[in-house]
């Protein structure tokens, strides 16, 4: 059984908020049997999250052992809890400290899965991954004598794409309601303020230009009006705590922006709700 505890066991610089099922053959097979009931669209949704804020790791330990893990790291505990409940994994939080640039780091929550459970999850999300496809293939190849099946790349139906896009946007995108106040003059020459009706806006920002362009193309084929892709040149900024020898200037990556407003944003929101 999963043991849930807020007593928070310490694990190095991390704390375990909720203990999941240990990765053994018996436990993994139990979880996999439950996961087999999940729909393909749910797997596409999960793939979107993994492409956005997830990780597929095949790093080895300092002793040369495989440390294969699939997981996700966020500041939103609720989402991490959902993944942990789904995959019967632990919820871990890093102890609060300060980032290298000197600013306070927000508490991050992590859940990850390994063993046969991770292999099964990787098999299911691989057909829907876009950004981390190679990571998934490398992950599966790390299992001895494991046959890699060929799957079509980026050949998703509209329903599969929208499920993936929903997960990806929950990781990388934002919806917001904009309220605009304008200065007007009436027929008597009197000045007054006019509050325009609230407007729904959506934006997706990422450093990967190709994935932004792919999303734009797919959405336009589905009838959404997309403005041209926005671009912001990566600027230079300080990195490292003030007053230390590690203080230096680094250049941030260029950013690409997908934007929808008004009715297009509302329709997109309704399309993503299911």
Whereabouts are the PLM-identified features?
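Internal intein/HINT superfamily modules and their associated LAGLIDADG
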Residues: 1-274
């Amino acid at each position: 059984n999963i043991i849930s505890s807020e007593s928070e066991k310490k694990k190095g610089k991390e704390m375990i908020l909720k203990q999941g099922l240990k990765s053994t053959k018996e436990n993994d097979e139990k979880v996999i049997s439950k996961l087999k009931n999940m729909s393909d669209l749910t797997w596409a949704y999960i793939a979107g999250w993994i492409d956005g804020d997830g990780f597929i790791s095949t790093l080895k330990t300092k002793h040369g052992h495989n440390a294969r893990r699939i997981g996700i790291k966020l500041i939103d505990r609720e989402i991490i809890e959902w993944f942990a409940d789904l995959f019967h994994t632990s919820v871990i939080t890093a102890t609060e400290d300060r980032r290298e640039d000197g600013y306070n780091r927000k508490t991050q929550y992590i859940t990850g899965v390994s063993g046969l459970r991770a292999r099964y999850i990787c098999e299911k999300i691989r057909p829907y991954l876009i950004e981390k496809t190679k990571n998934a293939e490398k992950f599966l190849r790390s299992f001895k004598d494991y046959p890699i099946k060929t799957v079509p790349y980026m050949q998703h139906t509209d329903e599969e794409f929208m499920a993936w896009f929903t997960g990806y946007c929950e990781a990388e995108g934002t919806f917001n309601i904009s309220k605009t106040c304008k200065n007007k003059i009436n027929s008597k020459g009197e000045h007054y303020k006019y509050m325009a009706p609230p407007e729904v806006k959506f934006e997706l920002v990422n450093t990967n230009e190709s994935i932004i362009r792919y999303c734009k193309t797919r959405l336009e084929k589905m009838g959404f009006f997309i403005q041209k892709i926005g671009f912001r040149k990566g600027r230079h900024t300080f990195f490292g705590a003030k007053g230390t020898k590690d203080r230096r200037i680094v250049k941030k990556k260029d950013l690409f922006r997908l934007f929808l407003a008004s009715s297009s944003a509302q329709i997109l929101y309704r399309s993503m709700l299911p």
